[in-house]
Amino acid sequence: MSTTSSVRVRLAFVALLSATTFYCIHKYRRLKHLKNLSLNPSSTLKASRGKIFFISQTGTAKALAQRLHELCASNDIAFDIVDPHSYEPEDLPKETLVLFIASTWDGGKPPKNGEFLVNWLGESAEDFRVGSLLLSDCKFAVFGVGSRAYGESYNAVAKELSSRMIGLGGLEMIPVGEGDVDDGELDRAFQDWCDGVIRVLKGGSAQETNGVSQQIGAVEDDLEYYDSTDEEDEDNDADGGIVDLEDIAGKAPSKRNGVVKVTKVDGKKEMVTPVIRASLTKQGYKIIGSHSGVKICRWTKSQLRGRGGCYKHSFYGIESHRCMETTPSLACANKCVFCWRHHTNPVGKSWQWKMDEPSVIVKGALDLHKNMIKQMKGVPGVTPEKLQEGLNPRHCALSLVGEPIMYPEINALVDELHGRRISTFLVTNAQFPEKILMMKPITQLYVSVDAATKESLKAIDRPLFADFWERFIDSLKALQEKQQRTVYRLTLVKGWNTEELDAYFNLFSIGKPDFIEIKGVTYCGSSATSKLTMENVPWHTDVKAFSEALSLKSNGEYEVACEHAHSCCVLLGRTEKFKVDGKWFTWIDYEKFHDLVASGEPFTSTDYMAQTPSWAVYGAQEGGFDPGQLRYKKERNHPPKPQAVLA
């Protein structure tokens, strides 16, 4: 009995061993056969229509996919462009040729339209029941679009696609191509990769293209193109001229047509590439040198015409028609969800570009600003007196776009402005505490406080720094060290941060700002990079209610001082410093400030305060509108809404 059992076990073992050996031999021969085909694929690929998948959040990958499709068509190679969102991954084993153009979104994750496909590949590759030959009939290539600013997650999706496809038996025709949206070389990198793909598809050797991935993305800059600002909403006509990075990628000239190379000086390249310069110029910016910009604000135009000033006029007494809006750094360290520049200017964690001199920037900004003011001559409401005043700027809002405090010579630039008796309002995004500490006295220093908790700050600001929260808190602490006027700027986004009342109040004690500006987010139109809608825009009554609640929380330390209803903005002031005998002193004595700076002696924020006029005080019937100006309301000629008809 035992002998029979032993024989059966041996026979079963031999059968298993034979089957395993046969499987291994079959798999080896199959893979060897497919590998040989991959080196000369023309005989097998011509009969099959390939697919180009674009995995895209904002349209960059889609635009590149369209370029690749046109290139293939010009070479008589048939492809279909496919949005993976509408594709059934279970059909992938039927494909014989696929090309992926894949971008990487926040946290190294795929954009929404490619989530299901990427996840399906990942799950299949990890599922032992699927096997490693599922895609053995499929040849593929991958090009990734990402930003080195995000470190290890750079082109993570493209690399994962390649790994998963190989793990399922797919044959990679050429190495993964990697393009960086920041370095100005995306078009060249993509074209090199495309050339490699076409070469293989037309029967060339895959080995000829092995160097492609090494050539792509050699620059190590720490930036990304996107757009941001802290200032007032822009004229409606500016939106039509915006060029998104996706459009740039789609319309950029090919390598054969001659790509404009990025200018380098002493090994450092210019922050603003020719393509980005063209984009920002279409948005109304005047570019100064290689990294600065100036733009005329809608409120500057408004007060030139006598139609009212911005909230700074109501809160601090600036003359809006004499205010220049500029920045010495178009780069930033955040990608805020409420950013309305449609993500077309750089971001970075440190300064790595060619640097222009402060005097050159200030002179260039003033010259360009004055030229824009001159264009207002003859516009209805613009008097010769107002025009002449506008040609002599007295204020500078260093908050146009980007992070001005990143500019290494920011103190020297401030000196240039103060030397011309131009006041300075600088806004920082609270990611560079060491820069705040080293700042010389300026008229008013802002820190953007876009959220009150670590989780919501990450969701709203989308910062590049991994230690963004620590930097944020340290920036608030640094603010407390400053002797001049300091401000927290809160941007309320309904449904995102309006419920964090207690958390906001806890931040007050860290920086102890002189003022707290609370402003409702401005809706800037739909964008693939932003999920905000009009539902996220608070009413002025919402902003007032939030401000009053914060004031109550402070137990009298802060009170609501001013409002500017048109901008949906409210100001809290520190009562012990700026409320004297029941009257608010939020305005600034600008001449006194410049005298104090020129003296070289230490001074504080109360040394140059001035009384707030009654029309700007919170609760006044004017709502912060200067009665010396003429209120103008646009006529809305929208067709009337259809009335319900009762049967």
Curated annotation (Swiss-Prot):
Residues 316-559 form the Radical SAM core domain. Its EC number is 4.1.3.44. Residues 50-198 form the Flavodoxin-like domain. CDD domains: Radical_SAM (cd01335). One of its GO terms (biological process) is tRNA processing. Pathway: tRNA modification; wybutosine-tRNA(Phe) biosynthesis. [4Fe-4S] cluster binds at C332, C336, C339. GO terms for molecular function: 4 iron, 4 sulfur cluster binding; FMN binding; metal ion binding; tRNA-4-demethylwyosine synthase activity. The keyword S-adenosyl-L-methionine applies. Probable component of the wybutosine biosynthesis pathway. Wybutosine is a hyper modified guanosine with a tricyclic base found at the 3'-position adjacent to the anticodon of eukaryotic phenylalanine tRNA. Catalyzes the condensation of N-methylguanine with 2 carbon atoms from pyruvate to form the tricyclic 4-demethylwyosine, an intermediate in wybutosine biosynthesis. This is S-adenosyl-L-methionine-dependent tRNA 4-demethylwyosine synthase. It comes from Arabidopsis thaliana. The gene is TYW1.
